[in-house]
């Protein structure tokens, strides 16, 4: 799902195309300091402890804050919950621990408060890494082709414009609800894993939600869980959108797609506030992560100078998060789509 429509033309402001023979593994990964791949158990578990404390402080703040401070505490708590996801994200890439079972169980536990099925996300996310910005195969913010948009009914066009436009922050919820609970799409061991993860979070929600409503009421449930959960999904939508969807970065058709280009030119480093990057564990330092998922989050900043030295001309310039940037990103594709449709309509009428 994406707000972007595939563009056939190249923008003059986007990074240079990466040569098709770029030896990504040899030229970049092998030049990295070996220490960036080392998993530090102390750092990994301290991250978990700090994140649990932050979420706990957030919930305490919700309990004691006067009404006019609740929005601030909600944003803090939802951002801290996003940190749970980021640690689980490392677990999904097996960069949290050398033991697969530790990664799986930590991932499941941290995904429980946000009701996210771990294995279905893990499997789908690995596909996103393998086919970043490739039409038909990348499952993160997959765009519509222009002809698909034209052939869709008016209702679907309006829906597309809304949820891939100014309501982008709902995109993560739609992705979560429509993709991650269907274990019938998988086969063999993966089907059993996805079924386990899905039933685990469904069971947890079936117990936790009624219990919260009975003990603290509907407003308490909304105040302590629903609103922080919505903040979490705001960040999920925003992070994942800006990682690979800037006006000058297109999704490519299979015959035009190149893996090295998608990982370098198609990935964006966007800076956020220090407190946000702290609570979300540098999830914005995304280029090193897309070159190799073996780097734990706490080492992601170390190889950045290496990437800039080797592939600097191919990297999209760093940007800073702002509402102006979000407006530019979410408005660009919809505007381009409407211009294209109007132009084609006028051309047809003239003919």
UniProtKB/Swiss-Prot annotation:
> What are the subcellular locations of this protein?
Cellular thylakoid membrane
- What drives induction of this protein's expression? Expression is light and temperature-dependent with a decrease with decreased light conditions or lower temperatures.
Q: Where is this motif: Histidine box-2?
A: 125-129
Keywords for the protein's UniProt record, in alphabetical order: Fatty acid biosynthesis, Fatty acid metabolism, Iron, Lipid biosynthesis, Lipid metabolism, Membrane, Oxidoreductase, Thylakoid, Transmembrane, Transmembrane helix
Q: Which cofactor does it need?
A: Fe(2+)
A single Gene Ontology molecular function, please? acyl-CoA (9+3)-desaturase activity
- The sequence motif named Histidine box-3 is recorded at 289-293
What is the protein's major site of localization? membrane
Query: Positions of the region Disordered?
Result: 1-20
Q: How does it sit in the membrane?
A: Multi-pass membrane protein
Q: What is its EC number?
A: 1.14.19.45
Record pathway: Lipid metabolism; polyunsaturated fatty acid biosynthesis
Family listed: Belongs to the fatty acid desaturase type 2 family.
The protein in question is named sn-1 oleoyl-lipid 12-desaturase
Query: What organism does the UniProt record list as the source?
Result: Arthrospira platensis
* Record gene name: desA
